[in-house]
Amino acid sequence: MGYKEGSAKKGATLFKTRCAQCHTTEAGGPHKVGPNLHGVINRHSGEAEGYSYSDANKRKGIEWTTEHLFEYLENPKKYIPGTKMAFGGLKKPKDRNDLITWMVENC
């Protein structure tokens, strides 16, 4: 099972409660513990300008499509061993779909 469009409204709540403490999304916004996510959809892994990524993220060599994000957000450390991301993941496919739908519209 892969990405299916979800609820952007529910995704906004998930972003605020699970992601915003480490990430910003506005154009030109600062990096925090994690990189600014503006423009992340279809960007290559490890390429947000000015952010210090782990070698693992740089080497992953993927484009952040909705499908890759769906897999990654389930278990970031399994998808990219060596990532600095300390987030344990969203186990429910519905939550990942909602968050990614919001990201497509807002990042």
From Swiss-Prot:
InterPro entries: Cyt_c-like_dom, Cyt_c-like_dom_sf, Cyt_c_1A/1B. One of its GO terms (biological process) is mitochondrial electron transport, cytochrome c to oxygen. Binds 1 heme c group covalently per subunit. Keywords: Electron transport, Heme, Iron, Metal-binding, Methylation, Mitochondrion, Respiratory chain, Transport. It holds the Pfam family Cytochrom_C. Coiled coil: none annotated. Its main location: mitochondrion. The keyword Iron applies. One of its GO terms (cellular component) is mitochondrial intermembrane space. Heme c binds at residues 19, 22-23, 85. The modification N6,N6,N6-trimethyllysine is found at residue 77. GO terms for molecular function: electron transfer activity; heme binding; metal ion binding. This is Cytochrome c. It comes from Yarrowia lipolytica (strain CLIB 122 / E 150). The lineage of its organism: Eukaryota, Fungi, Dikarya, Ascomycota, Saccharomycotina. The gene is CYC1.
